[in-house]
């Protein structure tokens, strides 16, 4: 259940005035930003992996789930704070992502895309049910002690420290990502490989290493999102990656799959849309609307908001 | 410097190169001419490791290139200007040049080399922050050449650098190739424009359906009736 709904009980009496309507609107926007930041972080991994090996990594949402569990155990067993939990989760999932690519996807690199896609779905199910096998199917409550809830009332707007934590850490991670992609040699190599793998090899760039790095970064971002989901919804479970994973996939397609800024914008749009649908319509419709967006974008502009209509690259 | 000996290369079921042999001597411009589909690009791709021969050897300074990973071949001093330029379109001119120097650790000298490329190609300097995809064909070719130079190659493989360019530009590009060679870089040049290629080469090979059918000095080949008929439009 979305916390967005709980937050709907606004701390002021709605007097049907314009101010209240405006406030409610801004409040929904704030709620949507947190959720959107989470979707954006997951969408980034989808889009980066697609950009470099043209594979929709359907196990990506489940990597997020593993990140949430690593964060959970880091807090409950090791007693770390939330930031350290996030860092541990990111490291663990970076390794996991690299291993998954090496074991499951690399051997299929020369084969058809559908073979790789089916393998990705298999990997997704493997992660979900392996986690159930190892840790049980029950949901776990993300410890409140790790993140005591504080609420701030700013000019009638209710903002929690959760929102601030999620938005700030997501923005910091996105800035770091942009720095890596734009400014570092590794990031430039990633872009070069995604544009033209053969030409990149001729520069002396190791394609295998670059793809590994891409999986590591994408999975680390998913792990951070996983910990955020734990904070945001309070509970985690082995199947928690499915729906956010799919919605982040929609976000990546909405922004233009393979386009990094597109994934960020797409994530925020999806998060805000979802809270608005829940807030003004009914939360029953929010998933339908999310996937309705996918259908619409595929019908109207399959290359996404940021995509150029160049057709398939050959 | 480079010996290609009796290589056989397949594209799936197609026998693309049939016992093809050629030799590139240090300091020279060697050209490989032939019609479309004769196997010129395949030869270059096999040397740079993108394709592997099923038999035969490729020896560069005593190293068997067929056993070296393609991304390591650059480190041995071989860089390539690929067919169709293949610049990284959504990256800037400077970023493309940086990619050419990807394996180099000497940051300062890389910077100096970039200045040298800009000296050679002032058009690129003007456009150094522009995306490579926005450049004209000629400028992209210059960028592809500049990018290959950034690796400080001893041997440069050039695949149809004149393709799709206006005659004036073609002349300019060939002048540049000659100049690069005069500064010590050995060049293996693949061309359909046989006339231009023969005018600057020291040695030439004619390839037809995957095999060398003629070789010799450019003067000899220019006189050959076969070459005249098939490639020089005479």
Regions found by a protein language model. Give the residues of each.
Chain A
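Cytosolic-side transmembrane-helix boundaries in multi-pass membrane proteins
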Residues: 3, 9, 14-19, 103, ...
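Membrane-interfacial amphipathic/re-entrant helices at transmembrane-helix boundaries
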Residues: 5-42, 70, 82-85, 111-116, ...
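Membrane-embedded helix boundary and interhelical linker motif in transport proteins
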Residues: 30, 52-99, 103, 108, ...
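Helix-loop-helix "hairpin" substructures at the membrane interface of multi-pass membrane proteins
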Residues: 35, 157-236, 260-265
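Short, non-helical or kinked segments that cap or interrupt transmembrane helices
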Residues: 37, 46-68, 82, 110-115, ...
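Transmembrane alpha-helical segments in multi-pass inner-membrane proteins
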Residues: 39, 79-91, 215-222, 226-292
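Alpha-helical transmembrane segments within multi-pass membrane transporters and channels
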Residues: 79-123, 130, 265-270, 301-302
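Transmembrane helix-bundle core of multi-pass membrane transporters
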Residues: 107-108, 112-183, 210, 276, ...
């Amino acid at each position: 259940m979305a916390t967005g709904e709980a937050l709907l009980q606004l701390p002021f009496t709605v007097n049907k005035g314009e101010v209240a309507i405006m406030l409610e609107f801004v409040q929904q926007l704030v709620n949507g930003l947190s959720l959107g930041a989470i979707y954006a972080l997951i969408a980034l991994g989808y889009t980066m992996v697609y950009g470099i090996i043209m594979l929709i990594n359907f196990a990506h949402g489940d990597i997020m789930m593993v990140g949430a569990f690593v964060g959970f155990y880091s807090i409950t067993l090791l007693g770390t704070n939330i930031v350290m939990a996030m860092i541990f989760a990111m490291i663990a999932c970076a390794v996991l992502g690299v291993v998954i690519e090496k074991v499951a996807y690399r051997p299929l690199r020369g084969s058809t895309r559908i073979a790789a896609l089916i393998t990705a779905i298999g990997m997704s199910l493997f992660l979900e049910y392996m986690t159930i096998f190892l840790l049980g199917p029950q949901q776990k409550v993300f410890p409140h002690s790790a993140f005591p809830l504080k609420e701030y009332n700013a000019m009638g707007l209710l903002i929690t420290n959760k929102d601030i934590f999620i938005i700030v850490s997501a923005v910091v991670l996105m800035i770091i990502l942009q720095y890596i992609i734009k400014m570092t040699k590794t990031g430039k190599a990633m872009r070069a490989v995604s544009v033209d793998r053969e030409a990149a090899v001729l520069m002396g760039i190791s394609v295998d290493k670059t793809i590994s790095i891409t999986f590591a970064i994408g999975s680390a971002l998913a792990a951070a999102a996983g910990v955020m989901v734990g904070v945001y919804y309070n509970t985690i479970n082995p199947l928690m990656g499915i729906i956010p994973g799919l919605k982040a996939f929609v976000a990546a397609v909405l922004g233009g799959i393979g386009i990094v800024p597109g994934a960020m914008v797409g994530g925020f749009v999806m998060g805000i849309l979802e809270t608005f649908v829940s807030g003004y319509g009914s939360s029953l419709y929010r998933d339908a609307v999310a996937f309705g967006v996918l259908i619409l974008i595929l019908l109207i502009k399959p290359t996404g908001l940021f995509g150029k209509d160049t057709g398939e690259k050959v | 410097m480079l010996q290609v000996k009796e290589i056989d290369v397949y594209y799936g079921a197609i026998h693309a190169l049939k016992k093809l042999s050629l030799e590139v001597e240090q300091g020279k411009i060697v050209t490989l001419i032939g019609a479309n589909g004769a196997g010129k690009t395949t030869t270059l791709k096999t040397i740079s490791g993108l394709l592997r021969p099923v038999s035969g050897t490729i020896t560069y300074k005593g190293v068997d290139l067929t056993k070296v990973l393609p991304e390591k071949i650059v480190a041995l001093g071989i860089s390539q200007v690929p067919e169709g330029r293949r610049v990284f379109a959504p990256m800037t001119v400077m970023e493309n040049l940086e990619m050419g120097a990807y394996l180099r650790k000497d940051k300062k000298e890389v910077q100096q080399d970039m200045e040298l490329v800009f000296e050679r190609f002032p058009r690129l300097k003007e456009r150094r922050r522009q995306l490579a995809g926005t450049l004209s064909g000629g400028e992209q070719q210059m960028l592809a050449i500049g990018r290959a130079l950034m690796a400080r190659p001893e041997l440069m493989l050039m695949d149809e650098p004149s393709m799709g360019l206006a005659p004036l530009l073609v002349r300019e590009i060939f002048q540049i190739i000659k100049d690069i060679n005069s500064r010590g870089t050995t060049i293996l040049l693949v061309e359909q424009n046989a006339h231009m290629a023969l005018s600057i080469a020291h040695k030439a090979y004619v390839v037809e359906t995957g095999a060398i059918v003629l070789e010799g000095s450019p003067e000899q080949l220019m006189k050959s009736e076969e070459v005249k008929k098939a490639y020089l439009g005479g």
